[in-house]
């Protein structure tokens, strides 16, 4: 519960925390100008960690990252699952076609042998 509270505190109080934390932007002033951010309005992560007494640890940071980017996170999970399923379906289809071909080869061989027997028996008459 504390982990969720830390994550929500960081996320709602400073929405750029995750961006600053993970993109490791060194020149925050230039970055803020590019995205039209007011640095006074969005305090730096150190301020929020001290002022709000949010415990900084790897689990909190990771949970914030997943919480903020959960759409992409689940997209990649679903992409991986669907890709894996599609590959398995393709392999199953190929295996099925190969097994059908082996059956057809056996049937063709039997037909050829039967025709050979018939033709040799007709030649004898």
From Swiss-Prot:
Which domain of life, per UniProt?
A: Eukaryota
Q: Major place of localization?
A: mitochondrion
The protein's UniProt keywords, in alphabetical order, are: Mitochondrion
* A GO CC annotation given for this chain: mitochondrion
Intracellular or extracellular location(s): Mitochondrion
What protein does this entry describe?
Answer: Uncharacterized mitochondrial protein ORF7
The species is Paramecium tetraurelia
Q: Taxonomic lineage of this organism?
A: Eukaryota, Sar, Alveolata, Ciliophora, Intramacronucleata
